[in-house]
């Protein structure tokens, strides 16, 4: 299965380019220039359509470092913006056990980002008044596989759990 999204670090030796690292849970969406945004939106639309053509609601699961990493918050906000522009209803849900209530973070550009605690039903991951058909992990699971993400057979989970750092090694 090809990755849903990825980033590649490239080394420029002046006479050749070489990929040196690939990330299946890319951060840095906030580094996209405005002229590149329509291309990112188009790619997001195409990727979602391949995975779940009837997708309307998308839940983004970020890293648990939200409270301490403002740069990463901008990354998540840009990712949310891209998928909203692609026509999806997008919400941000945290699997951080320390986040017990919806929290609004203020970004440098005066925008805010609402992050809500996820809820687990018997077979689905939801937010209050929001039931997504697709869940986008922007969390590499390097601290281990949280049980709350296991056995979600009714929802598309992208990338799949076996792509997380809890399973893979460099």
Protein language model regions, located:
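ATP-dependent carboxylate activation and anion-phosphoryl transfer catalytic cores
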Residues: 1-108, 133
């Amino acid at each position: 299965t090809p990755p849903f999204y990825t980033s590649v670090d490239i080394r420029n030796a002046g006479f050749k380019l070489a990929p040196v690292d690939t990330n299946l849970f890319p951060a840095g969406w906030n580094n996209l220039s405005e002229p590149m945004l329509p291309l990112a939106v188009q790619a997001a639309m195409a990727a979602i359509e391949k995975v779940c053509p009837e997708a309307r609601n998308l839940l983004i699961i970020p890293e648990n470092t939200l409270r301490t990493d403002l740069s990463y918050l901008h990354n998540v906000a840009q990712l949310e913006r891209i998928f909203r522009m692609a026509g999806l209803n997008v919400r941000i849900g945290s699997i951080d056990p320390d986040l017990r209530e919806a929290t609004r973070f203020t970004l440098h550009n005066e925008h805010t980002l609402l992050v809500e605690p996820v809820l687990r039903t018997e077979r689905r991951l939801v937010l209050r008044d929001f039931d997504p058909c697709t869940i986008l992990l922007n969390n590499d699971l390097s601290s281990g596989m949280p049980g709350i993400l296991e056995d979600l057979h009714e929802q598309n989970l992208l990338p799949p759990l076996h792509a997380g750092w809890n399973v893979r090694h460099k």
